[in-house]
Amino acid sequence: MAQKAPMTVTFVTGNQNKLKEVRAILGEEHADKFTLEARKVDLPELQGEPEDIAKEKVMLAARQIDGPTLVEDTSLCYNALQGLPGPYVKWFLDKLGHEGLNKMLAGYDDKSAYAQCVFAYVDGPNGEPKVFVGTTDGKIVPARGPTDFGWDPVFQPDGFEETYAEMDKAVKNGISHRYRALDKFREFILAEAAGR
């Protein structure tokens, strides 16, 4: 009996750093079961709760891809600001920079925050989206480390003395909000691939 070709999942991103990190977290050991290919798809910027945004984004993308589709929505949530900037952190970072993200908490004693990653997957344009959420608690600190990957320099996860940006990639990829969400996705997609 011939072995089935691996299931191909299209990850919607134009961010090469994110793609590299997602591939590193998912690993190559399951390449015979599923493969991840990246595709940049223009999607509208949606507003709402992170899980709702991810579900809507994956359905919009699946209509263009017409096959198994994966999207990600990441949030950085300040507890003192009741979760802001949340899913809008990209826009806050673009306008304020790392220093501005830090200064948002200048008037607050509470510097605690959490990083949240929401992946949404659907098997095609008529499917029902599935959501996988990962969260890492930490705090907002003055920017430290390389500044080439989003807000990583200002987020220091609980239990560590380094920001995400300062961490060895293997350490970050084993504790991050993205890892926690992808770990759930990996378990799901392996079961899906086995059932084909």
From Swiss-Prot:
GO terms for biological process: deoxyribonucleoside triphosphate catabolic process; nucleotide metabolic process. ITP binds at residues 13-18, 57, 73-74, 90, 149-152, 172, 177-178. Its cofactor is Mg(2+); Mn(2+). It is found in: Cytoplasm. It comes from the Eukaryota. Belongs to the HAM1 NTPase family. This is Inosine triphosphate pyrophosphatase. Pyrophosphatase that hydrolyzes non-canonical purine nucleotides such as inosine triphosphate (ITP), deoxyinosine triphosphate (dITP) or xanthosine 5'-triphosphate (XTP) to their respective monophosphate derivatives. The enzyme does not distinguish between the deoxy- and ribose forms. Probably excludes non-canonical purines from RNA and DNA precursor pools, thus preventing their incorporation into RNA and DNA and avoiding chromosomal lesions. Homodimer. It is an enzyme of class 3 (hydrolase). SUPFAM superfamilies: ITPase-like (SSF52972). The keyword Aminoacyl-tRNA synthetase does not apply. Mg(2+) binds at E45. Binds 1 divalent metal cation per subunit; can use either Mg(2+) or Mn(2+). It catalyses: ITP + H2O = IMP + diphosphate + H(+); dITP + H2O = dIMP + diphosphate + H(+); XTP + H2O = XMP + diphosphate + H(+). GO terms for molecular function: dITP diphosphatase activity; ITP diphosphatase activity; metal ion binding; nucleotide binding; XTP diphosphatase activity. Keywords: Cytoplasm, Hydrolase, Magnesium, Manganese, Metal-binding, Nucleotide metabolism, Nucleotide-binding. Its main location: cytoplasm.
